[in-house]
């Protein structure tokens, strides 16, 4: 459960991310595909080279979807409902990939922070991204 302090920290940390969605998204996906090559399975039709237009476009979609969750921290499930259905029922993405994506996104945020993230910010981001992952797998049966 996100506290009001968590929500405040997430919103503050997310500002630069949402303003640079394509950059953060593409970099996060590059980290994901590099660290966890099995995640490439769902993107066989993409050019997965760093900086490709496919990574930029899909990365922006990912960040925009998470931004919607940030903008609705009191109803993350509602904000991500359609996306959860899509990934569970149509795309059938392995649920563990959402957790891996969250970790890669945290690293990307930290890399662009200009210095170490404060422990309480890391904790709040981690709680939020775990909530996002949990929400996205909620439609799996």
UniProtKB/Swiss-Prot annotation:
Positions bound to O2: 58
Residues the record lists as binding heme b: 87
Biological process according to GO: hydrogen peroxide catabolic process
PANTHER family reported for this sequence: HEMOGLOBIN FAMILY MEMBER, HEMOGLOBIN SUBUNIT ALPHA
Oligomeric form and interacting partners: Heterotetramer of two alpha chains and two beta chains.
Role of this protein: Involved in oxygen transport from the lung to the various peripheral tissues.
Protein name: Hemoglobin subunit alpha-A
Species name: Drymarchon melanurus erebennus (Texas indigo snake)
């Amino acid at each position: 459960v996100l506290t009001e302090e968590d929500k405040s920290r997430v919103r503050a940390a997310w500002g630069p991310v949402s303003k640079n969605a394509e950059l953060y998204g593409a970099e996060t996906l590059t980290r994901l595909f590099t660290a966890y090559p099995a995640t490439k399975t769902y993107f066989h039709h993409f050019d997965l080279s760093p900086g490709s237009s496919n990574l930029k476009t899909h990365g922006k979609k990912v960040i925009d979807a998470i931004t919607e969750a940030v903008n609705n921290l009191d109803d993350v499930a509602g904000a991500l409902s359609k996306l959860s259905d899509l990934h569970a029922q149509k795309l059938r993405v392995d649920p563990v990939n959402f957790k891996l994506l969250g970790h890669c996104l945290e690293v990307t945020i930290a890399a662009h922070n200009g210095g170490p993230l404060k422990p309480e910010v890391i904790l709040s981001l981690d709680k939020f991204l775990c909530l996002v992952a949990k929400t996205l797998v909620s439609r799996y049966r």
